[in-house]
């Protein structure tokens, strides 16, 4: 791909087009989704066209998923670039020219509310990706993820109730991002594999 990149650089320079390069592991789909999301958000004041035909299938899926996740952005248009011809032999450039561009519809992908993502981030970044509900309750209140309206003598109980209803329950039952395990007198919150995958590109 290096020769093609150099050619693109030269063409952009001729046309006085600003070019920025971003690098990602081409086999890491979640890392790629996050990177595409960040680029789109950084360019939110511009019209954004996403070519899903250039690159591997993993890259195409990552680009399309990033567009679907950013459902609130109305200035994104993913498209498929249909080439004029295809290579006759393996080992050569796979396609040539541009016959047409086909706009692709964006279907919405549901994502958790921001407070749930903030809570998931606490678990994901915590030591060994687990912590007690008591620790989580304190951190959630300190970070404004939950609010507690109670007198001092009822504060701890009200904090647990708010954490359970607004954070723990949806993350466990609706999203499957965390699990609760009782060990001794403590209840431990641990992140699931699905939660780890989601954290890779949502937080």
Region annotations inferred by a language model:
Residues 1-47, 61-203:
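Long, low-complexity, Lys/Arg-enriched
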Residues 55-58:
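Polyanion-engaging groove/track-forming segments
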Residues 47-53:
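Short glycine-rich phosphate-binding loop at a beta-alpha junction
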């Amino acid at each position: 791909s290096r020769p093609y990149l150099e050619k693109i650089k030269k063409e952009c320079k001729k046309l006085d087009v600003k070019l920025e390069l971003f690098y990602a592991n081409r086999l890491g789909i979640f890392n790629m989704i996050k990177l595409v999301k960040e680029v789109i958000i950084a360019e939110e004041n511009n019209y954004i066209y996403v070519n899903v035909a250039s690159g591997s299938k993993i890259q195409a899926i990552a680009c399309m998923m990033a567009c679907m996740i950013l459902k609130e952005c109305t200035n994104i248009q993913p498209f498929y670039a249909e080439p004029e011809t295809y290579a006759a032999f393996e080992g050569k450039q796979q396609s040539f020219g541009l016959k047409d561009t086909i706009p692709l519809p964006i279907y919405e992908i549901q994502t958790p509310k921001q407070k749930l993502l903030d809570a998931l981030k606490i678990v994901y970044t915590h030591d060994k990706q687990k912590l007690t509900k008591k620790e989580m309750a304190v951190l959630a209140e300190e970070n404004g993820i939950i609010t507690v309206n109670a007198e001092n003598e009822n504060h701890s109980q009200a904090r647990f109730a708010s954490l359970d209803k607004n954070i723990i329950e949806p993350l466990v039952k609706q999203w499957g991002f965390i699990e609760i395990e009782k060990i001794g007198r403590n209840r431990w919150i641990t992140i699931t594999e699905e939660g780890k995958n989601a954290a890779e590109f949502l937080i």
